[in-house]
A protein has these predicted regions:
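Glycine/aspartate-rich loop-and-adjacent alpha/beta segment that forms the canonical ThDP
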Residues: 199, 203-257
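Short acidic, glycine/serine/threonine-rich loops at helix termini
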Residues: 67-69, 96, 146-148, 174-178, ...
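Generic beta-sheet signal
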Residues: 53-55, 131-135, 162, 211-221
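Glycine-rich beta-alpha junction loops
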Residues: 33, 61-62, 168-170, 198, ...
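Conserved thiamine diphosphate
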Residues: 129-130, 176-205, 253-256
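A short alpha/beta connector and helix-capping loop motif
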Residues: 144-169, 214-220
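Cofactor-binding active-site loop characterized by glycine-rich and histidine/acidic residues
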Residues: 13-19, 23, 28-157
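N-terminal hydrophobic or amphipathic helices/low-complexity stretches enriched
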Residues: 1-9
Length: 257
């Protein structure tokens, strides 16, 4: 599969952060393949135009990856992308609410995107909408009660065609070990586990599970992937210099070529 889209998104993430001096680079990098796989899945079905209205990024601090993808889709202009994080720009450090620009659900406070996704999915199933409801949840969001309340509701409403991607980049482990938490999730809900940086695996899971049953996809990822320097807590909210970004871009190109 062509890796150019992942490369382009990461290049744009780095430039946005350099320009704005704001953002979470490593957290955005860890979800890039998940986002790209969801887009490719819909695009192959001729439904790419439904991405924005059927996707919620619950871990809103990874929004620069979403901005990068939406820029590649033509939903955000280059001029707007250059103003990310600047005064007067609607493209802020977490997912904004701006339906006229294809941002339908704002997120930032952890644990909010999953319940909103379930509510939206439930209503859409009643109206005959057959497109899955996609949501990316961070591993740290499993510390939030709203996530567990929603998981229990997903058992009550098991056929809402939810596709819940857990970005298990181990970020939360530096505070609270999550391994046994995810063992509990696997026992209680239909769950599959994939390499969150392997697009073929993610696409295969989506294609092989084209049913109305809700599905949790545990994506094992690395913060800052594929940059080794970023896979540590120091880079959670650190901004690269332009020189560092240039070096990172070369490393990304080399990795994906």
């Amino acid at each position: 599969m062509n890796n150019q889209l992942q490369i382009n998104i990461r290049r744009k993430i780095l430039q946005m952060v350099v320009n704005s001096r704001e953002g979470h680079v490593a957290s955005s990098f860890s979800i890039t393949e998940i986002l790209t796989a969801i887009y490719h899945y819909l695009d192959e079905q001729g439904r790419a135009d439904q991405f924005a209205n059927h996707f919620i990024l619950s871990k809103g601090h990874g929004v620069y990856a979403l901005y990068g993808l939406m820029s590649e889709m033509g939903l955000i202009t280059d001029e707007e992308l250059a103003q990310v994080g600047q005064y007067g720009s609607y493209l802020i450090g977490h997912v904004p609410v701006k339906p006229e620009r294809s941002f339908y659900v704002g997120t930032g406070s952890l644990g909010q995107g999953l319940p909103m996704a379930l509510g939206r999915a439930y209503v859409r199933r009643q109206s005959g909408d057959t497109t899955p409801e996609f949501v990316i949840v961070g591993d740290g969001e499993f510390n939030e009660g709203s996530v567990w309340e929603t998981l229990m509701l997903m058992q009550k409403f098991p056929h809402c065609k939810m596709r819940v991607f857990v970005d298990n980049n181990m970020s939360s482990t530096r505070a609270i070990p999550m391994t046994k938490v995810f063992d509990a999730v696997k026992l209680g809900w239909p769950t599959l586990e994939v390499d969150g940086h392997n697009m073929e695996q993610i696409l295969q899971v989506l294609k092989e599970n084209n049913t109305d049953e809700n599905l949790i996809i545990l994506c094992n990822t690395k913060k800052g992937f594929p940059l080794k320097a970023m896979n540590n807590p120091v880079w959670h909210h650190r901004m690269p210099t332009q020189e560092e970004a240039d070096a990172f871009n070369l490393e990304i190109e080399e990795f994906f070529k």
